[in-house]
């Protein structure tokens, strides 16, 4: 999400994140990345904190992710990991069933 020349921010599944979440995380990023925490770990931590703040479960954050070196590498590492918003239920199953999600789980994730 940190690359201005593309990257994951261009994925339909991430619509809105580059403007909303990035703006919220920018002061933290400027202060702590990369010396204290990677961008990837910061985003994971932020997602877990947001989940708990909204009444969801507390999720343990595991640290140690390594940031992609450029926008091309960040895109290549994510291809096929997130669903395309304009595809149907078979596409969602292709993405989530291999990760152990049931149809019920997929519906909950999809909102």
Task: Set out the residue ranges of the language-model regions.
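Soluble secreted/lumenal catalytic domains
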Residues: 1-111
